[in-house]
Amino acid sequence: MKLRDSLAENNSIRLQAEANTWQEAVKIGVDLLVAADVVEPRYYQAILDGVEQFGPYFVIAPGLAMPHGRPEEGVKKTGFSLVTLKKPLEFNHEDNDPVDILITMAAVDANTHQEVGIMQIVNLFEDEANFDRLRACRTAQEVLDLIDRTNAAA
């Protein structure tokens, strides 16, 4: 499942969202996947439990979080949601706070998680200017166009 296709088909982009805590921000992304029938509602609690156990493991770059749980924690099919926050939030990550871009990922197996999910997100942000380009997006179509341009350049 391609990041762009998943976002378009699942209508799972929310821009300039407002959240007061990192937990609320994560829930926005998970709720988009629940609405698209990608994950069960329990996927949200699984992510929170993971943070309790391992810390903010999914904050992977300055300003960028990739919330995800394990396949057996309520994943129905592979999919992504993308959320940008109006106001960046602290996720208690030593190096990469504050966060204002969340790409929530659900993968049906570990292989898909690694090869499909993480690689597509790495490719999107290989050009660091894409962080600010994404922050500037105000419509879902602008996000999809940015991903298209990035894929065409790769």
UniProtKB/Swiss-Prot annotation:
The active site is at residue 68. It is found in: Cytoplasm. It comes from the Bacteria. The keyword Transferase applies. The modification Phosphohistidine is found at residue 68. It holds the Pfam family PTS_EIIA_2. One of its GO terms (molecular function) is protein-phosphocysteine-L-ascorbate-phosphotransferase system transporter activity. Induction: Induced by L-ascorbate. Repressed by UlaR. GO terms for cellular component: cytoplasm. Keywords: Cytoplasm, Kinase, Phosphoprotein, Phosphotransferase system, Transferase, Transport. Residues 6-150 form the PTS EIIA type-2 domain. GO terms for biological process: phosphoenolpyruvate-dependent sugar phosphotransferase system. The keyword Transport applies. PANTHER family: ASCORBATE-SPECIFIC PTS SYSTEM EIIA COMPONENT. The phosphoenolpyruvate-dependent sugar phosphotransferase system (sugar PTS), a major carbohydrate active transport system, catalyzes the phosphorylation of incoming sugar substrates concomitantly with their translocation across the cell membrane. The enzyme II UlaABC PTS system is involved in ascorbate transport. The PTS EIIA type-2 domain is phosphorylated by phospho-HPr on a histidyl residue. Then, it transfers the phosphoryl group to the PTS EIIB type-2 domain. This is Ascorbate-specific PTS system EIIA component.
